[in-house]
């Protein structure tokens, strides 16, 4: 019986939230809400428009650093290894390569948005 009550409450709450989410955005629709904001491209315009090369380079740089940071995620589990010196040396080399890459990007003004 408790399972049936919990299921009924969950279904009723879900339907209520879905109904609110369906009707609420239509109440105050204005142009700023409909404009794209993430990358500056209008998704409804032509696909042949040129895009900013600076945005592309910053996006690729972010993607590379994000993937390299993902290599650091297993470090807490690597501490449990038998040879902790190897783990520390590997993590130090990885962080050093990241720092050198960041310094190089900074020196080449790859992180500056304005020229």
From Swiss-Prot:
<dbReference type="GO" id="GO:0008137">
    <property type="term" value="F:NADH dehydrogenase (ubiquinone) activity"/>
</dbReference>
<comment type="similarity">
    <text>Belongs to the complex I subunit 3 family.</text>
</comment>
<keyword id="KW-0999">Mitochondrion inner membrane</keyword>
<protein>
    <recommendedName>
        <fullName>NADH-ubiquinone oxidoreductase chain 3</fullName>
        <ecNumber>7.1.1.2</ecNumber>
    </recommendedName>
</protein>
<keyword id="KW-0520">NAD</keyword>
<keyword id="KW-1133">Transmembrane helix</keyword>
<keyword id="KW-1278">Translocase</keyword>
<dbReference type="GO" id="GO:0005743">
    <property type="term" value="C:mitochondrial inner membrane"/>
</dbReference>
<dbReference type="GO" id="GO:0030964">
    <property type="term" value="C:NADH dehydrogenase complex"/>
</dbReference>
<feature type="transmembrane region" description="Helical">
    <location>
        <begin position="55"/>
        <end position="75"/>
    </location>
</feature>
<keyword id="KW-0830">Ubiquinone</keyword>
<feature type="transmembrane region" description="Helical">
    <location>
        <begin position="87"/>
        <end position="107"/>
    </location>
</feature>
<keyword id="KW-0496">Mitochondrion</keyword>
<keyword id="KW-0249">Electron transport</keyword>
<dbReference type="GO" id="GO:0006120">
    <property type="term" value="P:mitochondrial electron transport, NADH to ubiquinone"/>
</dbReference>
<dbReference type="InterPro" id="IPR000440">
    <property type="entry name" value="NADH_UbQ/plastoQ_OxRdtase_su3"/>
</dbReference>
<dbReference type="InterPro" id="IPR038430">
    <property type="entry name" value="NDAH_ubi_oxred_su3_sf"/>
</dbReference>
<keyword id="KW-0812">Transmembrane</keyword>
<comment type="function">
    <text>Core subunit of the mitochondrial membrane respiratory chain NADH dehydrogenase (Complex I) which catalyzes electron transfer from NADH through the respiratory chain, using ubiquinone as an electron acceptor. Essential for the catalytic activity of complex I.</text>
</comment>
<comment type="subunit">
    <text>Core subunit of respiratory chain NADH dehydrogenase (Complex I) which is composed of 45 different subunits. Interacts with TMEM186. Interacts with TMEM242.</text>
</comment>
<feature type="transmembrane region" description="Helical">
    <location>
        <begin position="4"/>
        <end position="24"/>
    </location>
</feature>
<keyword id="KW-0472">Membrane</keyword>
<keyword id="KW-0813">Transport</keyword>
<keyword id="KW-0679">Respiratory chain</keyword>
<dbReference type="Pfam" id="PF00507">
    <property type="entry name" value="Oxidored_q4"/>
</dbReference>
């Amino acid at each position: 019986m408790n399972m049936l009550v919990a299921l009924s409450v969950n279904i009723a709450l879900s339907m209520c939230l879905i109904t609110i989410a369906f009707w609420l955005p239509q109440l105050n629709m204005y142009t700023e809400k409909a404009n794209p904001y993430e990358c500056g491209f209008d998704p409804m315009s032509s696909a042949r428009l040129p895009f900013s090369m600076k945005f592309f380079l910053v996006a690729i740089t972010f993607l590379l650093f994000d993937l390299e940071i993902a290599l650091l995620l297993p470090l807490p589990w690597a501490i449990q290894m038998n040879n902790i010196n190897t783990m520390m040396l590997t993590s130090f080399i990885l962080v050093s390569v990241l720092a050198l890459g960041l310094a190089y990007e900074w020196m080449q003004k790859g992180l500056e948005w304005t020229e």
